[in-house]
Amino acid sequence: MVQIVSQDNFADSIASGLVLVDFFAEWCGPCKMLTPVLEALAAELPYVTILKLDIDASPRPAEQFGVSSIPTLILFKDGKEVERSVGLKDKDSLVKLISKHQ
């Protein structure tokens, strides 16, 4: 299941384990197209927590991590950024990106 986070709980949400964060905005077309891909990833890769952060409602984490284009996906391992992907990606590409850090 993909969960929505805010800037208030962002740091705690990425602190442990493997966490993929989708930095998105409600008005972003490619972001909307990415949602079913993330849902499929969540079902296929239960060892990864998948989160979505609305950069308009919660801008601080996006600023902190230098997110300037959306969708941006950042993979965190125990709170540290290990991978970044900008733009719409297919499920297979994201599985490869994540599996390197399993």
UniProtKB/Swiss-Prot annotation:
Residues 1-102 form the Thioredoxin domain. Pfam families: Thioredoxin. Disulfide bonds join 28-31. One of its GO terms (biological process) is cell redox homeostasis. GO terms for cellular component: cytosol. Keywords: Disulfide bond, Electron transport, Redox-active center, Transport. One of its GO terms (molecular function) is protein-disulfide reductase activity. NCBIfam families: thioredoxin. Belongs to the thioredoxin family. Participates in various redox reactions through the reversible oxidation of its active center dithiol to a disulfide and catalyzes dithiol-disulfide exchange reactions. This is Thioredoxin.
